[in-house]
Amino acid sequence: MESMGNNSPGPEIRALARNIRMSAHKARRVINQIRGRSYGQALMILELMPYGACYPISQLIHSAAANANHNMGLNKANLLVGRVEVNEGAVLKRIQPRAQGRGYPIQKPTCHITIVSEEISRSNDPIMSIESRKKGYVWRRK
């Protein structure tokens, strides 16, 4: 069983958005594309994706970068989108009026999105040196 503590060596920046009016399934579809990317790459990907979930997620990434800059004095260019979670929130229950006095239930789902960013440190950078990249070895972030 894994420990619940933080295993990353660098500082950790956190941003949380609660009660976002979209389903968690639709938000996870976008989140899976930006997990493990740098700050700039994540914003470029979100701008080009044709999903409505991209806007609140890009706002949250901007908020995490602002938290890093204000609270820890870190540069936005050195940030990495680390752990990202999308959890289901409360379901808003509404009634759709139908014929002959009936009403059909409508469920409007919400979700909570948490982004934990990390600073890219030069000593822990998993990308290999230029000589090894010329040989064809390229490491990928997990």
Swiss-Prot record:
It comes from Pinus koraiensis (Korean pine). This protein binds specifically to 23S rRNA. The globular domain of the protein is located near the polypeptide exit tunnel on the outside of the subunit, while an extended beta-hairpin is found that lines the wall of the exit tunnel in the center of the 70S ribosome. The gene is rpl22. The keyword Ribonucleoprotein applies. NCBIfam families: rplV_bact. It comes from the Eukaryota. Belongs to the universal ribosomal protein uL22 family. GO terms for molecular function: rRNA binding; structural constituent of ribosome. This is Large ribosomal subunit protein uL22c. GO terms for cellular component: chloroplast; large ribosomal subunit. SUPFAM superfamilies: Ribosomal protein L22. Part of the 50S ribosomal subunit. GO terms for biological process: translation. Its main location: plastid. Keywords: Chloroplast, Plastid, Ribonucleoprotein, Ribosomal protein, RNA-binding, rRNA-binding. It is found in: Plastid, Chloroplast.
